[in-house]
């Protein structure tokens, strides 16, 4: 895991003259790791819907590019444990215990599932917009001002 303390800024947000002690690691790999199916996660005959949704979200994450087969099995173990606690809490009518929830959260953090977890290990994901040509909303009055400025030779 990375260093303790507050989450560091993204590389493009930093202003520094010195080079970092541990620069952001970029890894190029050849080949892919096969993503296993979630499999049977049921506990007491039930699987909480959040478990399946979480596994689907993990599969769609860009961070899985760095996952090895052991990471996938660890993800399945973490989700199986979370499922057990969610189902048990539902049947007992009590929330998940704080210590158990902390342990599960640490397991999930080790999988680099959140922005903060990834930044701690100096891994950044940049998603390109789906439509690189569109998406910018411009006020009509701004467009008119720009056209008037061009027409009058002001720029």
UniProtKB/Swiss-Prot annotation:
Residues 8-19 have a biased composition (Basic and acidic residues). It comes from the Viruses. Residues 1-24 are annotated as: Disordered. This is Gene 5 protein.
